[in-house]
Swiss-Prot record:
Quaternary structure note: Interacts with ULK1. May interact with RAB11A and RAB11B, but does not exhibit any GTPase-activating activity toward these proteins. Interacts with TRAPPC8.
A GO MF term: GTPase activator activity
Record keywords: Golgi apparatus, GTPase activation, Phosphoprotein
Name of the gene: Tbc1d14
Name of this protein: TBC1 domain family member 14
GO cellular component: Golgi apparatus
Localization per record: Golgi apparatus, cis-Golgi network; Golgi apparatus, trans-Golgi network
Record field: compositional bias (Basic and acidic residues): 272-289
Disordered: region residues: 272-305
Ranges of residues in domain Rab-GAP TBC: 402-612
Organism from which the protein derives: Mus musculus (Mouse)
Any matching Pfam family: RabGAP-TBC
Record's keyword annotation contains Phosphoprotein: yes
Amino acid sequence: MTDGNLSTSMNGVALMGILDGRQGDSLQDLQHLSIKAAPRSLSVPEYGPSLKLGALEDRHSLQSVDSGIPTLEIGNPEPVPCSVVHVKRKQSESEIVPERAFQSACPLPSCTPSAPTCSEREQVVRKSSTFPRTGYDSVKLYSPTSKALSRSDNVSVCSVSSLGTELSTTLSVSNEDILDLMVTSNSSAIVTLENDDDPQFTDVTLSSINETSDLHQQDCVAETEEGRKLKLLHPFSHFFTRNLLARKQNARLDRQRDLGWKLFGKVPLRETAQKDSKKTQKEYEDKAGRPSRPPSPKQNVRKNLDFEPLSTTALILEDRPANLPAKPAEEAQKHRQQYEEMVLQAKKRELKEAQRRRKQLEERCKVEESIGNAVLTWNNEILPNWETMWCSKKVRDLWWQGIPPSVRGKVWSLAIGNELNITHELFDICLARAKERWRSLSTGGSEVENEDAGFSAADREASLELIKLDISRTFPNLCIFQQGGPYHDMLHSILGAYTCYRPDVGYVQGMSFIAAVLILNLDTADAFIAFSNLLNKPCQMAFFRVDHGLMLTYFAAFEVFFEENLPKLFAHFKKNNLTADIYLIDWIFTLYSKSLPLDLACRIWDVFCRDGEEFLFRTALGILKLFEDILTRMDFIHSAQFLTRLPEDLPADEVFAAISTVQMQSRNKKWAQVLSALQKDSREMEKGSPSLRH
């Protein structure tokens, strides 16, 4: 191939590929472009038969072949050194022309460079100029044989992928067609032209610069080896050119195409095409006609955490996109007013919620402050002088407000007392007996305890099984008394030790809740002492020993004060035959620890330790008074269900406010006097209706 002259005034457009006609064909006269010798030329290494290149007649611009396509001025493209043009022509029988590639740097040099040597030709990196994205021009070429083409020049573009990405373009060129390409300025092209008897297809693959440069270095070595083999296989050169070598080229192009992973037929964006989010936002604001303001460092800082309307951050008033018709002025004003109304309502809701939270916080701070002051009062004034101050009005008022949790266990122990004189050593003895009994029952041992002679092994075994069952159902929401919990063994020890301490009472359902509340506020031994003395009280002993006559006496006394304080609800219950034992048994057995929230139950226990069993029935009347309006509209079934399963969110202040309105006097008789009178009148007690009219 001889050196061809190409003018430097092509505005950055370089020739990318040459297609030779078959032998015997002639080139037609070019209509738009003639190539002739010029003093300034681009030196192309000679690898095969000479191929003459002419200069462009128009040195300033290129014109489109189709008059319907506007002619665009093309600026000098940036040098892209990785575009390779592969040219293959049909081999004649007398010569073997291997597949070659030539280079052209971009922009074109102003002077004719010297021809490279053989070694330089082998080491040189093949490059080709790339057209700008807006360039679209037709180029017509001479063949080395000065013969005219038999058909008019045309180009058929089969498929072009989206610009700005890795392009994969397929051009269909006939035997005498020429190439007209449109290439982006930031892509490189690998063009393979074949001139055979078969219908010819030209594959143009545009890839990134870095990927193409690596492949060309591998292609140079492969092409050199292919050319050397073709010279040795002269008779079969046409066969290898059409099949084997083309297959290798196709494999190489497939490898080129596989470099980019395609999802649903779309080529992913290159790293260089990714834009910054800030730049994209700025471009959008410029298109929308709003000037972009630099973000302030204080822009995202909320001045007032309490009254900032958080809900409005997800509600943004935006104009329509630039590609859509603008809103009418009336519609835009209407939308803005609606937006402002929504923001105003959101601010009101946020303000109301913030005020509620602030009020709760203030109340909590007041409660914590009062608890702190109460702790100091209990520790410094009351507990050191317990015997003289526990019945004073000041202490009783503090008691009603609730004992601080830090001193609650100590106050409970002092208020319950230790009339049974139980010591820690006695607790250890009872616990050891309980463990020995558990072991003997598990191994099936004989009865060796003389004191347990009146109790069968079946009763003791049933009692132990009942303890195990009740422990699993004690405060299940806390998950601290169940198997594996931190207080499981302590609760099991107290209940087991009590069954050994009072075998005549044994274990009764409901004891586990009382023992659990004591464990939460006392040590194990102190909890056992308080538990034993508490169950020794007359009311608890009557219920846990299931003294039916005495239990009816307590129910009758309760109905006396029930009728005195809530006559309307009392008559409604009488009408529906709803007796007190339906709801009182569970409340008295567990001391409200199962029926009410734990915090509220502890406050009830505080006053119960001060006032005794009277406060248990007063609390029952307070609960009935709190829900009097609801209960009067219920029938028997719904009333029983409601009272046996009270709401879980009962506020302590409302409950104690209702309790404070209950008067525990009936005809100038207090609770103790009424209960004593009922115990004396056993006959009236058996009828179930107390008679206090004498």
